[in-house]
Regions:
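Periplasmic alpha-helical coiled-coil/stalk elements that build and connect Gram-negative outer-membrane
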Residues: 157, 173-288, 399, 403, ...
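Outer-membrane beta-barrel proteins
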Residues: 118-122, 228, 335-339
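Terminal intrinsically disordered/low-complexity segments used for targeting and assembly
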Residues: 2-77, 124-126, 141, 165, ...
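Sec/SRP-type N-terminal targeting helices
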Residues: 83-84, 100, 137, 151-179, ...
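Heptad-repeat amphipathic alpha-helical coiled-coil interaction surface used
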Residues: 89-91, 96-98, 113, 161, ...
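Membrane-embedded beta-strand positions in outer-membrane beta-barrel channels/transporters
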Residues: 72, 142-146, 190, 289, ...
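Short flexible linkers and secondary-structure junctions
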Residues: 22-185, 324-328, 347, 358-368
Length: 518
């Protein structure tokens, strides 16, 4: 009668040993207070956001600046800060792989061979031949395979994988945050550079106007129709304007150098020509406050760090339970060496061991308490990061709203100041006022023009900041699961986002969507 051996019980036992149980708390994201509206945008009602309710893809195209469009994609591939964080992410992925390996047995093979001279008085019969004076030459050898396996009965290894996987995702989110931060820094530097160019154009026009005023005053001085002090005043104004124009070159050079470094180039490698065009103020869809939890990579980093700390509690708790190991050996051993692989020389062994700590002076309880404290610190960091995110967006929105009002007022002020300068100069030529009145009007006009340009710069910077504080089109759905390496892309989403086709942001609001900020 034949015996049938079923593989099902063996498979079930293996599954039990592999699965075991997992001690320690399972992770659940803690609740945070999320406002229904942004206070700086009254009338906003909470709704599920549509795809158009956040910056998308190449958000920088909304500024309509050729330099920005050319350089922004280079940040993700050439910026050295991003490169460093990418390497850190690769290291984190490797740590997940290392942790996963502990789930499986370690298989090895050992081979050895020995040839030795035995003493003449040896009684061993394991020799192949004799040499002079009765000495013996002994040959021996072995070929063995061995297996060792530490069983993860309590989930310590799986909690370690959970911890390392969450850490890897935190590293990926950190990479995304670094990429976004460097892209916003580039946008800021380009805006500063363009503002510097606009200031240069303004002062060049001012110098030209002052040269004309000085020429008129100098001609009148030749005929004695004006006081000599008028010439001095006009010349002083002109030279001050020229000095200010020269000084702008320092700041512009620094902005250009910063731009080069942000795209991974030496400053001398990047020549940025002067441009008279300022970037366009983009439309920035804001969306509901709750969506910021998914859009900000720094929040994702904090959340994943929290998950990693939660897993360490399980690792610490697992230390209370015994460690169970299995081992096996299978192979051949023979002395003398001839016929090593014969069935008669076959050997094997199976074994197991269990180790349990009886007393550790409170070490394990201390480890558990420390893990729980670290988790609570991570929770506080997560909630603090969320609060800071809401603060950042509110600051950006209030800045854009107030600066828009200031820009409207300055437009009127610049028009009036320009007209006032014309009137003052005409009155001076008519002899009804002295040149001090003209100089005062000119100074007021230049100051108002520079202030208006500064406000325009601030609005652009706030718009860039708002885009960054909303996540720049990033989403935590782009995070990869490092436990499934086959699904990992060659480059994480943060680095590949820069090559996304340009996506123009829409100024149309969907039902219940956030009004666009202009």
């Amino acid at each position: 009668m034949k015996m049938k051996i079923s593989c099902k019980p063996i498979a079930a036992a293996a599954a039990l040993l592999l699965g075991g149980c997992m001690v320690g708390p399972d992770y659940h994201r803690p609740q945070v207070n999320v406002p229904a509206t942004y206070s700086e945008l009254p009338g906003w009602t909470q709704a599920q956001p549509a795809d158009a309710d956040a910056p998308k893809g190449a958000w920088w195209t909304g500024f309509n600046d050729p330099l920005l469009n050319e350089l922004e994609p280079q940040v993700a591939v050439s910026n050295q800060t991003v490169a460093q964080d990418y390497a850190n992410y690769q290291e984190a992925l490797a740590e997940v792989k290392v942790a996963r390996s502990a789930l499986f047995p370690t298989i090895g093979v050992t081979g050895s061979g020995t040839r030795q001279r035995a003493s003449a008085g040896s009684t061993s019969s394991s020799f192949t031949r004799s040499v002079g004076s009765g000495a013996q030459i002994v040959n021996s050898g072995s070929l063995e395979g061995n297996v060792s396996w530490d069983l993860d009965l309590w989930g310590s290894v799986r909690r370690t994988i959970e911890e390392n996987s969450a850490t890897a995702q935190a590293s990926e989110a950190t990479l995304a945050n670094a990429t976004l931060s460097e892209q916003i820094a580039l946008a800021t530097a380009v805006i500063d550079l363009r503002t510097s160019d606009a200031n240069i154009d303004l002062l060049q026009a001012t110098v030209k106007a002052y040269e004309h005023f000085l020429e008129v005053v100098s001609n009148q001085d030749k005929y004695g129709t004006v006081a000599p002090s008028d010439v001095v005043t006009a010349r002083t104004q002109l030279e001050n304007a020229r000095a200010s124009l020269i000084a702008l070159g320092v700041a512009r050079a620094q902005y250009a150098h910063a731009i080069a470094v942000l795209v991974g180039k030496n400053p001398e490698e990047l020549n940025i020509p002067h441009s008279a065009a300022m970037p366009t103020l983009p439309t920035v869809p804001v969306g509901v406050p709750s969506t910021i939890l998914q859009r900000r990579p720094d929040i994702a980093t904090a959340e994943r760090q929290m998950a990693a700390e939660n897993a360490t509690i399980g690792i610490a708790v697992a230390a209370y339970y015994p460690t169970v190991s299995l081992s096996a050996l299978d192979g051949f051993t023979q002395s003398p060496l001839g016929g090593l692989l014969h069935v008669a020389n076959y050997v094997w062994s199976l074994g197991g061991s269990a180790t349990e700590t009886i007393f550790d002076g409170g070490e394990r309880s201390g480890e558990v308490a420390a893990a729980k404290a670290n988790y609570q610190a991570a929770v506080a960091n997560y909630r603090g990061t969320v609060l800071t995110a809401f603060e950042d967006v509110e600051n950006d929105l209030s800045g854009l709203r107030i600066l828009a009002e200031q820009a409207d007022a300055l437009d009127t002020a610049v028009r009036d100041a320009t007209h006032g300068t014309e009137i003052a100069f005409n009155e001076y030529q008519a002899g009804t006022v002295d040149y001090t009145t003209v100089a005062t009007a000119q100074a007021t006009q230049l100051a108002d023009q520079q202030t208006a340009l500064s406000v325009q710069q601030s609005r652009l910077l706030d718009a860039a900041s708002l885009i960054g504080d909303l996540g720049g089109g990033w989403s935590d759905s782009q995070l990869h699961d490092p436990r499934n390496p086959d699904k990992l892309q060659a480059q994480p989403a943060a680095a590949s986002a820069a090559s996304t086709p340009a996506a123009q942001t829409s100024s149309t609001t969907s039902q219940g969507a956030q009004p666009a900020v202009q």
